[in-house]
Amino acid sequence: MLIKLLTKVFGSRNDRTLRRMRKVVNIINAMEPEIEKLSDEELKGKTAEFRARLEKGEVLENLIPEAFAVVREASKRVFGMRHFDVQLLGGMVLNERCIAEMRTGEGKTLTATLPAYLNALTGKGVHVVTVNDYLAQRDAENNRPLFEFLGLTVGINLPGMPAPAKREAYAADITYGTNNEYGFDYLRDNMAFSPEERVQRKLHYALVDEVDSILIDEARTPLIISGPAEDSSEMYKRVNKIIPHLIRQEKEDSETFQGEGHFSVDEKSRQVNLTERGLVLIEELLVKEGIMDEGESLYSPANIMLMHHVTAALRAHALFTRDVDYIVKDGEVIIVDEHTGRTMQGRRWSDGLHQAVEAKEGVQIQNENQTLASITFQNYFRLYEKLAGMTGTADTEAFEFSSIYKLDTVVVPTNRPMIRKDLPDLVYMTEAEKIQAIIEDIKERTAKGQPVLVGTISIEKSELVSNELTKAGIKHNVLNAKFHANEAAIVAQAGYPAAVTIATNMAGRGTDIVLGGSWQAEVAALENPTAEQIEKIKADWQVRHDAVLAAGGLHIIGTERHESRRIDNQLRGRSGRQGDAGSSRFYLSMEDALMRIFASDRVSGMMRKLGMKPGEAIEHPWVTKAIANAQRKVESRNFDIRKQLLEYDDVANDQRRAIYSQRNELLDVSDVSETINSIREDVFKATIDAYIPPQSLEEMWDIPGLQERLKNDFDLDLPIAEWLDKEPELHEETLRERILAQSIEVYQRKEEVVGAEMMRHFEKGVMLQTLDSLWKEHLAAMDYLRQGIHLRGYAQKDPKQEYKRESFSMFAAMLESLKYEVISTLSKVQVRMPEEVEELEQQRRMEAERLAQMQQLSHQDDDSAAAAALAAQTGERKVGRNDPCPCGSGKKYKQCHGRLQ
């Protein structure tokens, strides 16, 4: 009560921020008459003038009024569109490292041009981040004329582009692209083998469109670049055959309870656990299939990988549903993003889950992957010097934006008052009753010419509603991940009188639904439209537009509540744009996932008490409150998951930044010999210490062990025992110095043979490859540590502290291994004069030809073409990575001269 009173007197923080910014808007408006007088060339020249002022030390913030006035004037001349005052407010919010909440239809794309132009003046680059390639391309092409008019360059960063094209896109003043592509480019740059392969510049300013979708919904999904691990597809197929024999454990109070099942499912945490009965049965089935030996336990350490396969298969069958979590297209399992409803081509679940789903669906199983590099969106976007974002729904997540990204949320007022009617939820007992009520509502609305958008939470549900509408004879369009190719066309015409559109969450974010349909889309469909045709299309559209407004505007129907209130608000936000009329209503049933998992007992008890009849709906503030509480519970749980993920990833992030910083320094220098010499001293000191403890008696020395170690690991055959016999006065310190001097001398002789330049190149390559290889192993080890660390809680230890402690020890051990591996590899390298290599290669060829002739003689009855092909293969075969190296070292090619390929 007191807080409300104080807010009334002093205004909220949001009000105070907007009040301060409105003063700047007044200054911009006052400048407008002067800016209007400038010629096109003078307006364009302002960009160079602003840049010159920045170079002289002027602060960027001082340029805001004039820069925004210039962009507004340029927009009037290029697009015929003038930024509203609220858009100027939005632009200022975005320049202040804040999240701007701007309602649907308020022109976020045009608003973004203001801070993008201002920050591009620094010459450090601006990254505009969108949720998909279509929006990146559309926004870049739409805004390109404006930016180019002002003398700025625009780049588009799309998946699959060659490195030179990407480099060019990043070199532009303003770059448009998707969150995934920016993140993957960052990881790829940190796996490059030469400075020329890198594409990104220093991360300066990111302007994130649909910021809630990217920084919150996708925050639990790390970006991973992976390489193939060993093939275990056969095991997934064999385990998959067993799972249908298991019965799910139902709750004791449920109608389907029939005694103890074989596995229980926790839908909240999305986990599956075997019961005692299930363990006995699955062990019997595994023995019967010949996968496990009689008498063995599934939980024995030897069967840890088998347990991994069983868990993955159980999760695939019990928790992941076709056309909800994934679709099968062209023999491939493609993930469907739970938040946007879009397919995620190229993305795969980890921990063997994707392979288990492939086995379940009977499609080709692709190899498991090993992580080569990974980063979460949370940590990637925190790398930018300056971060800002905009969305139609941010206020519900303001606390998370503030606590994780240190970004304040500012709600920007609408240009015209919002007049949409949000009707109370209707709750039914069963799904069938709910669907029937939705069909009746659609019939009523379309009869009076009102367009309807039906929002569903999955592809499966959208197809269920579509089938019911078809049975009822109602014409409609379906927009989901299966039919997303014509997304823009469907959304553009969803505002037609009596149009019915069914959409998953993808519901055309970034595309406005215009009442009466889009006249621009109709004009674009004509090849060479005349002025008369365009005028007629506009006139027809105006009639339709007025008819839809008279019917009540766009009506939104939600077929069930989403886990997050924000995503429900996004669906509602498709209606009532720019002060238009509109309405919305959510239809729920006790069989909906949210109600079943989080709100079922209380609400169903309430409904039973009210004595509801089939087909009747409940509409009561208590029910609405119970649903809102359920959503808050889920949001709170998801926030905790994301926060915990970030706390663990922060540990890995510190290590990642250290490794990537070291790697980039290594890439940028051409001579690493000083580093190598320093490392060599450390490695030899540690190696000798293991066999000759410092300041110890000679009796404690293990000379044979040291000689063997130096021979095996550093290719140094030193007669240390002989030295000690001949020189009894040889001290420990002198001995250490002699061993190190010998190793340096041997190395220098190799350098003389190949030349200093070649040796420097080789040293750098070995360091990079060894670093990448050990970092990859370290990531896998960190992943294993992370999966089991929660068990430390049972020993009264804090899992997070334990994770920090152990991961630091692992990181320190990895750095020691790096030094050792580099010196060992460089010491073992065999160098020969070019003539010797040529001679060895000649001998190898002759031997190969001799073998080929012998094979031909032993297969004289074979088809001559096959024999010739065999001879060609054997005679001119390239050196395989696991073949002996042709230099004669006796090592595998990949560990010798093939290391740099």
Curated annotation (Swiss-Prot):
Its main location: membrane. Transmembrane segments: none annotated. Induction: Repressed under conditions of excess protein secretion capacity and derepressed when protein secretion becomes limiting. This is regulated by SecM. Its cofactor is Zn(2+). ATP binds at residues 87, 105-109, 512. Pfam families: P-loop_SecA, SEC-C, SecA_DEAD, SecA_PP_bind, SecA_SW. GO terms for molecular function: ATP binding; metal ion binding; protein-exporting ATPase activity. Keywords: ATP-binding, Cell inner membrane, Cell membrane, Cytoplasm, Membrane, Metal-binding, Nucleotide-binding, Protein transport, Translocase, Translocation, Transport, Zinc. The keyword rRNA-binding does not apply. Its EC number is 7.4.2.8. It catalyses: ATP + H2O + cellular proteinSide 1 = ADP + phosphate + cellular proteinSide 2. May bind 1 zinc ion per subunit. The keyword Coiled coil does not apply. Part of the Sec protein translocase complex. Interacts with the SecYEG preprotein conducting channel. Has a central role in coupling the hydrolysis of ATP to the transfer of proteins into and across the cell membrane, serving both as a receptor for the preprotein-SecB complex and as an ATP-driven molecular motor driving the stepwise translocation of polypeptide chains across the membrane. It comes from Escherichia coli O127:H6 (strain E2348/69 / EPEC). This is Protein translocase subunit SecA. Residues 891-901 have a biased composition (Basic residues). GO terms for biological process: intracellular protein transmembrane transport; protein import; protein targeting; protein transport by the Sec complex. Zn(2+) binds at residues 885, 887, 896-897. Belongs to the SecA family. It is a peripheral membrane protein.
